[in-house]
C-alpha cells in the first residue's frame, strides 16, 4: 500500500491579549487579515502543510487566549509542543514586559524534557502602526532580551502587511524540528475497495 510519511509539529503562540497572535496565524495560514478584533476564547488552532528540506510536515499552530482567566487551560494545550512563539506589540511596553511571565508559564506547564534548550521564537508585531511613530520597544531592547534567554531568534512583523511573517514561520518550523519526537503520521494514499475497509491512519515510531 502506498503511503506518504508526514510529521506533525505542534507550535504554541503566546502573548498578551491584542498583540496580534490570531492575525499572525491567519496571515501565515490563510494569507488574510481582518481589522475587526475578536478575542480568542480559550484556544484555537489552524493547520498548514509545509515542506522543509524535502520533507512534508503538518504544522499545527495553537493560538491561545491572552486573558488571565484562561491561563489555567495551559497544561492541556502546551503539552507536546515542539516550539513556543512569544509575541508582543512593539507599541506596548507592557506586552514586552510580560514576555518573561509567558515564557516561565510555558516552561512550568508544558514541562519540556530539556527546558534550557527548548526552542522559542520571539515576534515583535505591529511594526506598521502609525508608520512606526508609536513604537516604544526598540529592536535593540528586544534583541538584548533574546540574548539573555539563550539567543532566541527574533523577527519584527506586521500581520496586516505580511511583513516577515513567512520568514518567521520558516524559522519556527526549523526550530521545532530540533525538538521533533521520533514519531510520524502515516497517511495512506489508497483505500482497500475490494475488502470494503478504509485504510486507517496510524502513528508509530521510526
Swiss-Prot record:
Any one of the GO BP annotations: protein transport
InterPro entries assigned to the protein according to its UniProt record, in alphabetical order: P-loop_NTPase, Small_GTP-bd, Small_GTPase
Pfam entry (one): Ras
Disulfide bonding pattern of the chain: none
Compartments it resides in: Cell membrane
Main location (coarse class): membrane
Highest taxon listed in the record's lineage: Eukaryota
GO cellular component, one term: vacuolar membrane
Residues reported in the UniProt entry to bind GTP: 15-22, 63-67, 125-128
Single annotated GO MF: GTPase activity
Described function: Protein transport. Probably involved in vesicular traffic.
PANTHER family according to UniProt: RAB FAMILY, RAS-RELATED PROTEIN RABG3F
Family stated for the protein in its record: Belongs to the small GTPase superfamily. Rab family.
NCBIfam families according to UniProt: small_GTP
Record's protein name: Ras-related protein Rab7
Taxonomic classification: Eukaryota, Viridiplantae, Streptophyta, Embryophyta, Tracheophyta
Amino acid at each position: 500500500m502506498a503511503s506518504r510519511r508526514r510529521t506533525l509539529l505542534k507550535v504554541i503562540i503566546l502573548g498578551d491579549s491584542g498583540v496580534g497572535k490570531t492575525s499572525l496565524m491567519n496571515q501565515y495560514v490563510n494569507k488574510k487579515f481582518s481589522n475587526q478584533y475578536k478575542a480568542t476564547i480559550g484556544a484555537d488552532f489552524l493547520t498548514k502543510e509545509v515542506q522543509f528540506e524535502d520533507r512534508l510536515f503538518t504544522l499545527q499552530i495553537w493560538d491561545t487566549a491572552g486573558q488571565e482567566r484562561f491561563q489555567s487551560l495551559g497544561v492541556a494545550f502546551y503539552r507536546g509542543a515542539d516550539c513556543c512563539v512569544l509575541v508582543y506589540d512593539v507599541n506596548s511596553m507592557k506586552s514586552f514586559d510580560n514576555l518573561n511571565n509567558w515564557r516561565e508559564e510555558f516552561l512550568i506547564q508544558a514541562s519540556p524534557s530539556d527546558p534550557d534548550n527548548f526552542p522559542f521564537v520571539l515576534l515583535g508585531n505591529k511594526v506598521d502602526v502609525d508608520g512606526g511613530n508609536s513604537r516604544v520597544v526598540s529592536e535593540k531592547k528586544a534583541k538584548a532580551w533574546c540574548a539573555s534567554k539563550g539567543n532566541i531568534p527574533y523577527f519584527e512583523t506586521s500581520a496586516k502587511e505580511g511583513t516577515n511573517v513567512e520568514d518567521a514561520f520558516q524559522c519556527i518550523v526549523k526550530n521545532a524540528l530540533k525538538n521533533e519526537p521520533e514519531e510520524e503520521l502515516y497517511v495512506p494514499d489508497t483505500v482497500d475497495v475490494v475488502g470494503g475497509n478504509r485504510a486507517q491512519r496510524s502513528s508509530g515510531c521510526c
